[in-house]
C-alpha cells in the first residue's frame, strides 16, 4: 500500500507544483497566504469492539497560495487557493490508536464574491504509528498499515481581524483509508469543529475574456485500468495476498459550462481474486472466467482544472454474479448492506492530461489521460486503480 499512497501523493503534489510554478506577469502571480488551524472532534466508531477514542485533535499548518488569474480556469472557480496542509493528529488513545502525521495537497474555493464562507477539499497521505497488528494491536480495524490516504473536506467562514489577518471557523471531516489494498480497512472518519488564523493580501483579480469564446466538443473516452486489492470483507481475511484486476471503460464526455464534463458509460472488469476463489471453493462448474467479471453502467462529472481534473462516478452493476453467489454461500445475502453492495459501485479519481493546452478549459477531445482512482461498493472500499485512456 505504501507505493500506492506515495503515487497518489505525488500526483496531488504534481498538480500543486505545476499550478504554482512562477509566472512572468506580476499582476497575476500567485501570492503566499499561509494559515494555522486547530480541529477538535470525534472519531466515528466503526465496530463495537474497536479501541475507545476519548477525542480527536488535529493541528494543521496550511501552506497555500492565492491565485489571481494566471490561468483561465482560476476565474471559473472563483480564484481558488492551492497548497498543502501539514497535519498532526491525535486520536485520544495513544496505546492502540496512536498518532498520525499527514501531508494533504488542497484546493480551497470561496462561496461567492459577497459571502465569506469557503470550501476546502484535499487528498493526500498519512503515516500512522499504531496500525493493526495481529499480536500487539488486534482490534484496530480502522487502519491496516502504517501508510494510508488522508482526505479533508471543510466548510468554513472567515472574519477579518485586520488588514493582514483573517479568523477561520467552521466544520471539517477527515477520512483515512487504504482503498482495501491491506486488510483490515474500516477506515477512520473524524468529524470536527475548527478554528484558525490566515494571512491575506489585497491584490487585484484578473478576469480573461478568452473564456467566453472557447467552445468545447463532445468526446468519447476509451480507458484501461489496473486495480489492486486484498480479497475479503473489511475486517476479515487479514494478511491475505494482493490481487490485480483489469478494467476496460468506455464513456461519452459532454462538456458542461466551461469547467466541467458530464459522463455516461460502461465499465467491464475482470477480478483475479474472484477467479481464485471460484476455483478453490468450486463455486461454479463452468464459465469461471466469465463469472469473474463485472459489468457496470455509470454517470459522472469531471471537474477540470487546467491540465488536471477530479472525477466522481456513480454506477449500477448490470452483471455481478460472483458477489451474489458468494454472499449466498456465506449465508449473508439477506443483509441489506450486502444487497446494496451487489448493485451500487462508485469511483473517485484524479486525472492528468499531459498534452492538453493549458488554457483550453474543458476541451478534452484528442487528449491522453492518466489517472488514479479509488473504487467502492456503496461506501466500502474495493480497490485502488491506475488508469490510462484517450478521448476520441
Region locations from a protein language model:
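Gram-negative (and chloroplast) outer-membrane scaffold detector with strong preference
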Residues: 78-129, 254-324, 329, 352, ...
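Membrane-embedded beta-strand positions of outer-membrane beta-barrel proteins
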Residues: 34-38, 82-84, 119-123, 153-155, ...
Amino acid at each position: 500500500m505504501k507505493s500506492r499512497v506515495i503515487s497518489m501523493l505525488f500526483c496531488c503534489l504534481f498538480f500543486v507544483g505545476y499550478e504554482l510554478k512562477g509566472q512572468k506577469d506580476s499582476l497575476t502571480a500567485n501570492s503566499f497566504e499561509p494559515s494555522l488551524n486547530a480541529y477538535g472532534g470525534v472519531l466515528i466508531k466503526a465496530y463495537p469492539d474497536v479501541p475507545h477514542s476519548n477525542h480527536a485533535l488535529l493541528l494543521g499548518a496550511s501552506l497555500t497560495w492565492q491565485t489571481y488569474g494566471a490561468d483561465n480556469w482560476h476565474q471559473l472557480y472563483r480564484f481558488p487557493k492551492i497548497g498543502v496542509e501539514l497535519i498532526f493528529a491525535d486520536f485520544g488513545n495513544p496505546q492502540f490508536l496512536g498518532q498520525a502525521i499527514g501531508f494533504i495537497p488542497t484546493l480551497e474555493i470561496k462561496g461567492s464574491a459577497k459571502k465569506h464562507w469557503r470550501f476546502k477539499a484535499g487528498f493526500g497521505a498519512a503515516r500512522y504509528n499504531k496500525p493493526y497488528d495481529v499480536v500487539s494491536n488486534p482490534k484496530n480495524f480502522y487502519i491496516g498499515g502504517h501508510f494510508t490516504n488522508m482526505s479533508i473536506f471543510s466548510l468554513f467562514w472567515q472574519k477579518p481581524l485586520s488588514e493582514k489577518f483573517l479568523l477561520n471557523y467552521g466544520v471539517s471531516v477527515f477520512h483515512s483509508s487504504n482503498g482495501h489494498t491491506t486488510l483490515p480497512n474500516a477506515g477512520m472518519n473524524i468529524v470536527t469543529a475548527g478554528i484558525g488564523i490566515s494571512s491575506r493580501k489585497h491584490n487585484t483579480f484578473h478576469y480573461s475574456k478568452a473564456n467566453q469564446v472557447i467552445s468545447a466538443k463532445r468526446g468519447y473516452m476509451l480507458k484501461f485500468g489496473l486495480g489492486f486489492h486484498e480479497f475479503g470483507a473489511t475486517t476479515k481475511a487479514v494478511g491475505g495476498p494482493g490481487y490485480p484486476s483489469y478494467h476496460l471503460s468506455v464513456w461519452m464526455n459532454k462538456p458542461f459550462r466551461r469547467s466541467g464534463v458530464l459522463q455516461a458509460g460502461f465499465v467491464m472488469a475482470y477480478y483475479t481474486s474472484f477467479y481464485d476463489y471460484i476455483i478453490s471453493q468450486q463455486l461454479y462448474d463452468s464459465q469461471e472466467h466469465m463469472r469473474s467479471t463485472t459489468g457496470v453502467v455509470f454517470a459522472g462529472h469531471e471537474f477540470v482544472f487546467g491540465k488536471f481534473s477530479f472525477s466522481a462516478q456513480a454506477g449500477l452493476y448490470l452483471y455481478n454474479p460472483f458477489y451474489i453467489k458468494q454472499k449466498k454461500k456465506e449465508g449473508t445475502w439477506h443483509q441489506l448492506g450486502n444487497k446494496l453492495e451487489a448493485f451500487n459501485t462508485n469511483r473517485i479519481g484524479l486525472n492528468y492530461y499531459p498534452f492538453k493546452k493549458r488554457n483550453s478549459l474543458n476541451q478534452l477531445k484528442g487528449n491522453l489521460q492518466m489517472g488514479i482512482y479509488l473504487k467502492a461498493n456503496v461506501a466500502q472500499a474495493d480497490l485502488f486503480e491506475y488508469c490510462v485512456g484517450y478521448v476520441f
